[in-house]
């Protein structure tokens, strides 16, 4: 929180509701009183593996928990792993059913405008991405943010803004903590993923400070309602 204050930064917190139940009241109240809140599902499952019914149940449960805890209507949604891209046949229908108004769950290489309204009257705020083989390099957050040099991050964000995207940074709580103990894995894949997840954490706040010299940090809700 102190680091965000030093940057003069506001943000949208997309929250996994199963996790928020485990946090103390002080943290919950700090988020409630200082940041815009969105829904990031109930338990952060890959949505492409869920049926329409399962996604419906997960979304209903997640939204009710967040609205009960924060005592406010939750109108924004972000899909875990950007996995809504594979279930667009029912994704927006379910969001509309549960009275969401905004989503930031889709990655596009090009967009005609920064906010796209679909047939269910859900306003999608896409992130810019480009392909590298079978992978999508998303601008910009998580591992991409930690391993990419600041100068390139700023260049990518400016390019996104130039091409009708809202220049967004997305980060997880673990991206900020260089002092957290590493998890122990037996298999090689787990060990490699663990090392990747810790790489570059110490650079995050310096990069955010550098970005703040070029852009003003704000929440999605404040940006939409400017």
Regions found by a protein language model. Give the residues of each.
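Catalytic alpha-helical scaffold of carbohydrate-active enzymes acting on polysaccharides/glycoconjugates
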Residues: 1-76, 81-133, 149-226
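Surface-exposed cleft-lining segments at the edges of enzyme active sites
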Residues: 48, 137-147
